[in-house]
Amino acid sequence: MEKKTIIDLFESSAKRFPSNPFLWEKTGKRFEPTTYSEVRDLVYEEGAGLISLGVRKGDNMALLSEGRNAWIIGELAMFYAGATNVPLSIKLEEANDLLFRLVHADVKYIMVSGQQLKKIRAIKEKLPAVRTIIVLDERAEYQDREMPLSEIRRMGKVYLGIHP
């Protein structure tokens, strides 16, 4: 039996069921669907944006977020860029526990939700190997080494325009 990766399985499903809902997320009082095709477009944009940012095959990236569409899309984008995801539980409250995992895994990039950002900010000065912290939620301002996910997507669109 041929071994299939998560990317293989996702691509197969996106080709077979492009208009079918893949993800559901509550916005206001209703759950809204996102189709396989829409998710694939977002994953391609984010993955290309990560490559444009400098993510290379084998780089370790961390993902610290509550369960949500951006988490799934972000993880798939990491895989498309060739990175390895170092998943982190939002239940990690002790700075030393989080710091240990990030340093031990030699994480170079972090994707983090707005709710979890304070945990990363509290330790980021002890993370010199981390090049960029990608914030999943828009904020009024960003600190050193932080950038919004929207910028990654913008970079991805430019990259895909040059490298279709």
Language model regions located:
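AMP-binding/adenylate-forming domain of the ANL superfamily
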Residues: 1-24, 41-42, 60
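Conserved AMP-binding/adenylate-forming core of the ANL superfamily
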Residues: 22-76, 93-99, 148-156
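A short hydrophobic/small-residue beta-strand
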Residues: 61, 85-86
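Structural motif
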Residues: 62, 109-113, 134
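ANL superfamily adenylate-forming
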Residues: 115-164
